[in-house]
UniProtKB/Swiss-Prot annotation:
Family membership: Belongs to the methylthiotransferase family. RimO subfamily.
InterPro entries: Elp3/MiaA/NifB-like_rSAM (IPR006638), Methylthiotransferase (IPR005839), Methylthiotransferase_CS (IPR020612), Methylthiotransferase_N (IPR013848), Methylthiotransferase_N_sf (IPR038135), Ribosomal_uS12_MeSTrfase_RimO (IPR005840), rSAM (IPR007197), rSAM_horseshoe (IPR023404)
Listed SUPFAM superfamilies: Radical SAM enzymes (SSF102114)
Protein name: Ribosomal protein uS12 methylthiotransferase RimO
GO biological process: tRNA modification
Keywords: 4Fe-4S, Cytoplasm, Iron, Iron-sulfur, Metal-binding, S-adenosyl-L-methionine, Transferase
All copies of domain Radical SAM core, residue ranges: 137-368
Molecular function via GO: 4 iron, 4 sulfur cluster binding; aspartic acid methylthiotransferase activity; metal ion binding; protein methylthiotransferase activity
Residues reported in the UniProt entry to bind [4Fe-4S] cluster 1: 16, 50, 82
Subcellular localization(s) per the UniProt record: Cytoplasm
EC number annotated for this UniProt entry: 2.8.4.4
Length: 439
């Protein structure tokens, strides 16, 4: 029997969903603490930091400083994750308020670090396996599954390989065991994630690793629904798109950050791909019935000229992505682009404003296309007194939108799970919908 200590833990997980999986592993090791959202009352404050781009680093630092100010006497403040790893040589002196620092290699040893009150930085990047206990947060029906760590790409702007290392894929069998274990606990919707999902098993000499995973999950039949995030253009193929399309479990959801469309910019960004390849993949994705396509763009990479930006702008308006993340270039140490001549901030801001207008127009169109017709959805939890929170089954959690259920044709109380719903109204970036039936 697991006995709770009379101690409280406040966990703050910053950054991406991959970081969240590592945070959930740490919660699994600290199961005997009582969770609290109040840092002031916590005996342990654990901040899993992000160190991806400048804005994320600033958020991590500010969160640490706020926690240091709020923590009660005798409480332990821990900074783990990417920021700590990336700046491990200087961070201890820069933020002396922190009691324990650890990077990206020791999430499964967090209980030992707290007991010994000591820092720990291992050389090997941690990759969660099926035997690592996790406490899933945020949902009783959805879980993330991390399939690999690190990245072998050499993008000019990205520092991730410098602190996350080279591609390190999990064994397929380990992933299947984790999926089965989580499904038995009621998690029947999953999102598979990595830095570069489409390169899964490349490090083990297999070019069709993600296709193998899709087919194995289909055969296993433990899940009702799933989707994949972070496809990389150079390792995405028409065969992979076809495997997703033909899967009864994986949704027709395509998240492929293209970063740019101009051939000259793709070369400057060292993306190991071309406009022609991008277009071939994107057109194939669009041909898939009821596909949902998300991408990411970087604006203002060094040497991006006006004609390259105009080419990007025209393409985005023509293609009409369902969702689009638009980032300003962030100059990061230990990257090729760091020392290149920068595009003026004023120019970057103007370009972002123009692209945001295009993105919002097509995003709203994508939302409105769901109105007044039955769609498959996942109801996750109650939202306030009168609503339930749901999402289109194709969507990834948090990032693609929100549906509020305000009516139901069921004769029994609504609970988290898979339902057919009918959206009836789109207001303030939220869809309102009625539940029709479970499936």
């Amino acid at each position: 029997m697991q006995v709770k200590e009379n101690k409280q833990l406040c966990l703050i997980s910053l950054g991406c969903s991959k970081n969240l999986v590592d945070s959930e592993v740490m919660l699994g090791k600290l199961y005997n603490y009582t969770l609290t959202n109040d840092a002031k009352s916590a005996d342990v404050i654990l901040i899993n930091t992000c160190g991806f781009i400048e804005s994320a680093k600033q958020e991590s630092i500010q969160t640490i400083l706020n926690a240091a100010k709020d923590k009660k006497e005798g409480a332990i403040l821990i900074a783990s994750g990417c920021l700590s790893e990336r700046y491990k040589d200087e961070i201890k002196e820069l933020i002396p308020e922190v009691d324990i620092f650890t990077g990206v290699g020791d999430y499964d040893k967090i209980d030992i670090m707290i007991a010994k009150k000591q820092n720990q930085f291992s050389e090997q990047v941690f990759l969660s396996e099926h035997y690592n206990a996790r406490i899933i947060t945020g949902s009783s029906v959805h879980a993330y599954v991390k399939i690999s760590e690190g990245c072998n790409q050499k993008c000019s702007f990205c520092a991730i390989p410098s602190f996350k290392g080279k591609l390190q894929s999990r064994e397929l069998d380990s992933i299947l065991k984790e999926v089965e274990n989580l499904a038995l606990k009621g998690y029947t919707d999953m999102t598979f994630i990595a830095q570069d999902s489409s390169s899964f098993l490349y490090d083990k000499g297999q070019k069709d690793g993600l296709i193998q995973l899709i087919r194995a999950i289909d055969k296993q039949q433990a899940l009702k629904s799933a989707r994949i995030l972070y496809l990389y253009p150079s390792s995405t193929t028409l065969e992979l798109i076809g495997a997703i399309e033909s899967s009864p479990i994986f949704q027709n959801y395509f998240d492929m950050p293209i970063q740019h469309i101009s051939d000259s910019m793709l070369k400057k960004m060292r993306r190991n791909s071309s406009q022609a390849h991008h277009l071939k993949l994107l057109d194939a994705m669009k041909q898939v019935k009821e596909s949902f396509i998300r991408s990411t763009i970087i604006v203002g990479h060094p040497e991006e000229n006006e004609s390259e930006f105009e080419e990007l702008s025209a393409f985005l308006d023509e293609f009409q992505f369902d969702r689009l993340n638009i980032f300003a270039f962030s100059a990061e140490e230990n990257t090729h682009a760091y020392s290149l001549e920068k595009v003026p901030k004023k120019t970057i801001n103007a370009r972002i404003k123009a692209l945001n207008k295009i993105a919002l127009k097509h995003q709203n169109h994508s939302f409105k296309a769901l109105l007044n017709k039955p769609i498959k959805a996942l109801v996750e939890n109650k939202e306030g007194e009168y609503f339930y929170k749901a999402r289109d089954l194709r969507w990834a959690p948090e990032v693609d939108g929100e549906i509020l259920i305000n009516d139901s044709e069921l004769t029994t109380p609504l609970k988290p799970g898979h339902y057919t719903i009918a959206p009836s109204e789109f207001k303030d970036n939220i869809l309102l919908a009625k539940v029709l039936s479970p499936f």
